[in-house]
């Protein structure tokens, strides 16, 4: 039987997505599987990895059935996943507790203590990243200090994609691109640093062996095949970080090429071919061997608009029932009627603390500039602009660190909004290309499998065959001039309020 199809699995924050692609990158079928985020306390955000697996099984069965292909026709499986999990497994492979996810900041005190005890510079020298509560490192220490009954049973710590690979194959692995979540990972050498493990208090035996993202870690077991509907023996590659796989799926594989992320969280990833680190940013390995990604990330990406729609769009939801027009599209329409700069309304998108470049887990979302003349449209447009202003902030820091961001390649749900994409182009002053596929992240995971099993000879071939452009946005110079002033206000606003955004 001809094996010419690839399956990509994306472990997102609110749902998984599974898609089957042909060799040309066309989607035969796709399905989602939802799961909750739990917020037990302020600053906490956690998920049950077994709920990820259940959702993956449901979505995989549905996808393969809708694709109308035999499971045995799938040549390989690739997995991408959200960052900075701390999935604690015992010796039998049982999940011991819910994992804190990327937006969880419960370990802030631990980070402050470790930075003082070890030294911020010494940690940064090894890891290429500052120690923040969002990362995996402090979450492991948090287990030790707050859940000793869990900690004493830990055999291995996994990331989101490596957990799904484990469920599919039984193999325990750690891919290169997710290594950056642990500050005992040497970002220059691409291996665990035993001395930093000791100083951080992380046992080396907790850490799986490092492998490349396109490495075949195993094949689908009989048990997994029965649960998810794939064929026993199907090769599975290690996969990688969702942002890095999305970067590949958007066609970003050479230095200077940049991916703009518009999913639940926002941000950017610039491809570089040499080590460049800045404590205000995030440095990780690309899913492509020999490349790094200099990244910036805001907690408030597309999630900002979903929050606004949920809390303030009762009228739009009512109209949706009458007209069928989605409430988000209606919000886009009212925002489009507002002038660039939202007539002075500025929004700080720090809805769950903030990551780069300010790294403040206590930062809060702020609307500034409201008066009786302002409307819902002003607030909607300000939300879009606030996320774009954060993107510009990250890009400017990255370029100051020596990276070169030329054209941005947009991915994620917000790329479907012509208005929002144009706002990002105007604010950053960068052209933005939108790939034809709206499944760049899942496609990137599938391409890892395609290269891993030999369906493509290399990543240049894979991208040239599968990644197409659907539209291009050029920055409007007049709007850019307005936004330059808005950006100054944005920076000054946080600077003025930062002393209030503390524990």
Region locations from a protein language model:
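A short local loop/turn or secondary-structure capping micro-motif enriched for an aromatic residue
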Residues: 36-39, 105-107, 302-303
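Short beta-strand-loop/turn "lid" adjacent to the catalytic site in phosphate-handling enzymes
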Residues: 65-102, 130-136, 161, 165-185, ...
